[in-house]
């Protein structure tokens, strides 16, 4: 299997953490790929029309898109029910938490692209503020309802690690650690896991 990835991508990081936790990392060839916002990225569009990272390319040439779907595939490959509960109320709680985190990451990337790609005179601050509020309020929800922080390690906790790591990486002055001490403690605890530490994004 091959995984297209960038060390800076929180979505690719999610898959990398999962692969390590599931004992499958040695079965995956991690292939660096560059997707530049606002550029055609024609070569990468041959792999996926969405031009998004990551993509898992199976040995038969078929592709699996979306970081969650890739983790779900790897989880099943490892026997199932490891990072995504197989059934019951916990399954739906974990999936719902992950969906929230996925949306938070989407909004954070949109904020990043607004500043990085759009010419300064055309940037829309109200739009950026709206999307940042989605990420910030999502953090507030996990701070207020911290049950997700103490479950056995799952896909939602991986997603939260990636959200907080991306906040440190791209929004270092946002103040999330001071605002959300429970999330700060959770993140520090997670850094003790080799999968989390080895997958940290590069220095911004």
Task: Identify the meaning behind each predicted range.
Residues 185-199:
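Charged phosphate-binding loop/patch that engages nucleotide di/tri-phosphates or the phosphate backbone
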Residues 1-125:
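GST-like domain detector, emphasizing the conserved glutathione-binding G-site
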Residues 148, 199-204:
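Long amphipathic alpha-helical segments
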Residues 71, 75, 95-98, 139, ...:
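Non-transmembrane alpha-helical segments in soluble domains
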Residues 56, 158, 190-193:
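Residue-level signal for nonpolar/aromatic packing positions in well-ordered secondary structure
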Residues 101-188:
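GST-like fold's C-terminal all-alpha helical module
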Residues 59, 161, 202:
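Conserved residues at the C-terminal ends of beta-strands
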């Amino acid at each position: 299997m091959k995984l297209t990835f960038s060390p800076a991508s929180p979505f690719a990081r999610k898959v990398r953490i999962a692969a390590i936790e599931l004992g499958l990392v040695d079965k995956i060839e991690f292939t660096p790929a560059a997707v530049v916002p606002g550029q055609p990225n024609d070569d990468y569009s041959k792999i996926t029309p969405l031009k998004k990272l990551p993509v898992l390319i199976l040995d038969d040439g078929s592709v699996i898109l979306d970081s969650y779907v890739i983790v779900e595939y790897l989880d099943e490959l490892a026997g199932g029910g490891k990072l995504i509960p197989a059934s019951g109320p916990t399954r739906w709680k974990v999936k719902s938490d992950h969906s929230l985190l996925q949306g938070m990451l989407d909004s954070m990337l949109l904020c990043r692209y607004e500043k990085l790609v759009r010419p300064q005179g055309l940037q829309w601050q109200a739009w950026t503020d709206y999307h940042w509020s989605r990420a910030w309020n999502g953090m507030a929800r996990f701070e207020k309802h911290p049950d997700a922080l103490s479950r056995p390690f799952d896909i939602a906790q991986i997603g939260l690690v990636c959200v907080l790591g991306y906040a440190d990486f791209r929004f270092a002055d946002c103040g999330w650690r001071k605002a959300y001490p429970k999330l700060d403690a959770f993140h520090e605890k997670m850094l003790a896991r080799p999968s989390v530490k080895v997958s940290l994004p590069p220095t911004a």
